[in-house]
UniProtKB/Swiss-Prot annotation:
UniProt xrefs under NCBIfam families: aroA
UniProt superkingdom: Bacteria
Function text: Catalyzes the transfer of the enolpyruvyl moiety of phosphoenolpyruvate (PEP) to the 5-hydroxyl of shikimate-3-phosphate (S3P) to produce enolpyruvyl shikimate-3-phosphate and inorganic phosphate.
Gene that specifies this protein: aroA
Name this polypeptide is given: 3-phosphoshikimate 1-carboxyvinyltransferase
Subcellular location(s) of the protein: Cytoplasm
Pathway: Metabolic intermediate biosynthesis; chorismate biosynthesis; chorismate from D-erythrose 4-phosphate and phosphoenolpyruvate: step 6/7
GO cellular component: cytoplasm
Record-level GO BP terms: amino acid biosynthetic process; aromatic amino acid family biosynthetic process; chorismate biosynthetic process
Reaction equation(s) it catalyzes: 3-phosphoshikimate + phosphoenolpyruvate = 5-O-(1-carboxyvinyl)-3-phosphoshikimate + phosphate
Length: 427
């Protein structure tokens, strides 16, 4: 498709879709709790629909009237063996988190995914879940999907130091630990998004957190709840960046999630000199309205504990850095290599084709700004965040056309993205 280019000013108000991470977890917790869970503002992207379909196949009654998703949970014990393979599509979150649920079930399941998911590492969950007593086999010695998983009712507690900073692995182990008899201890390498921990408490469970240590007991009773999902800050990130880099822009983003483990982009933008204000803060839901204005930006250095707080935003932050004065360095971000694509390689190649001065490193990238961008023909590579980054980059192109193929990947997390983009440009 031909993307919109040569944007002068963007003004408007957007309500971004529900947070993908929270939507997945709300569906899972509703399905493993006793009683009725009602969820408002769920993201209805392809990834979350994979999670919903998986639990439907395991016997959970889930209804969607277009506004509210209602789940009639019967607890872990109410799950039944699916008749077919569980197809997780493109969703690594679905596969890893649901593997934790399945580890304590006494039936065999095979989980499959699309071509992209079939290249993503699963040994990071297979190893600890196997230590707990589940049997997991995949391609190349448990490394890759499809995954065949045989759970057990005799799942053992675990003491485990996460070798990578991964909220998905942490969450899989939490779901497994809930099905054990005894106390588990999970130690994070760096603190990652804590939606699973927050939601356990919301559903009536308990866990102790001290620094990077999480302790929880198995056998807890979870009870269905009413949940409102805030907007996804990872989706809002595209509008934050476009508001900062297109002259005279003024964009208002309503109901954006501001969980402290996810707001790294706000800290980085502020450090770079970006004008962004928070208002209408809801401390219960952890959401706020963000107002973004065009800004003159300075380069920065992003590394260490900051990386897990903005790992999904790094592609669009790389674009932001092309429009900042000076050299921006992103380091300690090797986890980007095992996302839907090798995001270090694909971000660098895509922005280079558009004229950016950007270099890949072993664990990140170096971006020298400020550089104009030019026309190019590009591909999403099956990665929703790459597609959206390119669509925002195209707005900076003054002459010629930017062609994007594979744009359907954007439906993974933001089905209305291109429609919202057009609305801002034409406002």
């Amino acid at each position: 498709m031909k993307l919109l280019t040569n944007a002068n000013t963007l003004k408007g108000t957007i309500r971004v879709p529900g947070d993908k991470s929270i939507s997945h977890r709300a569906i899972i917790f509703g399905s493993i709790s006793q009683g009725v869970t009602r969820i408002v503002d769920v993201l209805r992207g392809e990834d979350v629909l994979s999670t919903i379909e998986a639990f439907k196949q395991m016997g959970v009654l889930i209804e969607d009237d277009g506004e509210i998703i209602t789940i009639y949970g019967k607890g872990f014990a109410g799950l039944t063996q699916p008749n077919n393979l569980l197809d997780m599509g493109n969703s690594g979150t679905s596969m890893r988190l649901i593997a934790g649920v399945l580890a304590g079930q006494e039936f065999e399941v095979t989980m499959v995914g699309d071509n992209s998911l079939s290249k993503r590492p699963m040994d990071r969950i297979a190893l600890p879940l196997s230590k707990m007593g589940a049997r997991i086999s995949g391609v190349t010695n448990r490394d890759l999907p499809p995954l065949k998983l045989q759970g057990t009712k005799k799942l053992k507690p675990i003491f485990y130091h996460l070798p990578v900073a991964s909220a998905q692995v942490k969450s899989a182990l939490i779901f497994a630990a809930l099905q054990t008899k005894g106390e588990s201890l999970i130690v994070e390498k760096e603190q990652t998004r804590n939606h699973t921990e927050d939601m356990i408490r919301q559903f009536g469970g308990h866990l102790d957190i001290k620094d990077k240590e999480i302790r929880l007991n198995g056998g807890q009773s979870l009870v269905g709840q009413d949940i409102r999902v805030p907007g996804d800050i990872s989706s809002a990130a595209f509008w934050i960046v476009v508001g900062l880099i297109i002259p005279n822009s003024h964009i208002i983003l309503e109901n954006v999630g501001i969980n402290e483990t996810r707001t790294g982009i706000l800290d980085v933008v502020s450090k770079m000199g970006g004008k962004i204000k928070l208002s209408s803060v809801d401390n219960q839901v952890k959401s706020a309205t963000l107002t973004v204005d065009y800004s003159h930006l300075q380069a920065t250095h992003i590394s260490g504990a900051m990386i897990p707080r903005l790992i999904d935003e790094l592609p669009i932050i790389a674009l932001l850095a092309t429009q900042a004065q000076g050299t921006t360095v992103i380091a300690d971000a090797q986890e980007l290599k095992v996302k839907e694509t090798d995001r270090i390689q694909v971000v660098v190649e895509s922005l280079k084709q558009m004229g950016a001065d950007i270099t890949a490193t072993a664990d990140g990238m170096i971006i020298r700004g400020n550089t104009p961008l030019h026309a190019a023909s590009l591909d999403c590579h099956g990665d929703h965040r790459i597609g959206m980054m390119i669509a925002i980059a195209a707005l900076l192109v003054k002459e010629g056309e930017v062609d994007l193929s594979g744009e359907e990947a954007i439906n993974t997390s933001y089905p209305n993205f291109l429609e919202h983009l057009e609305g801002l440009v034409n406002a």
